[in-house]
């Protein structure tokens, strides 16, 4: 049996719907929790997709969550990705990875040091 990775989604805006719709076609990961700075957005997402809504910090500290799906606005991709990596989580982010080269290189350095994967969508959900 293949491993099923437990994913925490951060950023419950419009693009999150696309990921939830596409996620049912994959059997190697499961979105188990969501968070958003707007708690009402997280609660709505959680209710719709029958998962748990938590704060960003709770999600990052949850030992069951292995991968963070970063769907936040571009200006905060770097901050969320960095916090995720520093909390021992693999990260898959919507584009762009960071809004400048310096921050992008820093994320790569952290991911290599901690032996974590850092991925970035070339287009929404691999074109899904």
Placement of each model-derived feature along the sequence:
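A contiguous active-site-proximal alpha/beta segment in oxidoreductase catalytic domains
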Residues: 98-128
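Short helix-capping segments at alpha-helix termini
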Residues: 26-28, 87, 112-116
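Glycine- and other small-residue-rich loops at beta-strand/loop junctions that grip anionic moieties
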Residues: 12, 70, 96, 121-122
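Hydrophobic beta-strand scaffold residues
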Residues: 31, 53, 91, 117-118
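Conserved donor sugar-nucleotide recognition element shared by glycan-biosynthetic enzymes
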Residues: 15, 19, 52, 77, ...
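Acidic-histidine catalytic/liganding microenvironments
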Residues: 26, 62-63, 127
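N-terminal Rossmann-like dinucleotide-binding module
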Residues: 1-49
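Beta-loop-alpha module in the N-terminal Rossmann-like domain of NAD(P)-dependent dehydrogenases
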Residues: 51-110
């Amino acid at each position: 049996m293949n491993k099923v990775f437990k994913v925490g989604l951060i950023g419950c805006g419009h693009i999150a719907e696309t990921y939830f719709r596409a996620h049912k076609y994959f059997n190697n990961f499961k979105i188990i929790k969501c968070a958003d700075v707007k708690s009402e957005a997280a609660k709505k997402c959680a209710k719709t997709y029958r998962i748990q809504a938590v704060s960003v910090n709770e999600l990052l500290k949850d030992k069951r969550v292995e991968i963070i799906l970063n769907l936040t606005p571009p200006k905060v991709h770097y901050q969320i990705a960095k916090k995720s990596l520093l909390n021992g989580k693999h990260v898959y982010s919507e584009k762009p990875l960071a809004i400048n080269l310096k921050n992008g290189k820093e994320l790569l350095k952290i991911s290599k040091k901690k032996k974590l994967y850092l991925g970035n969508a070339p287009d929404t959900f691999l074109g899904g």
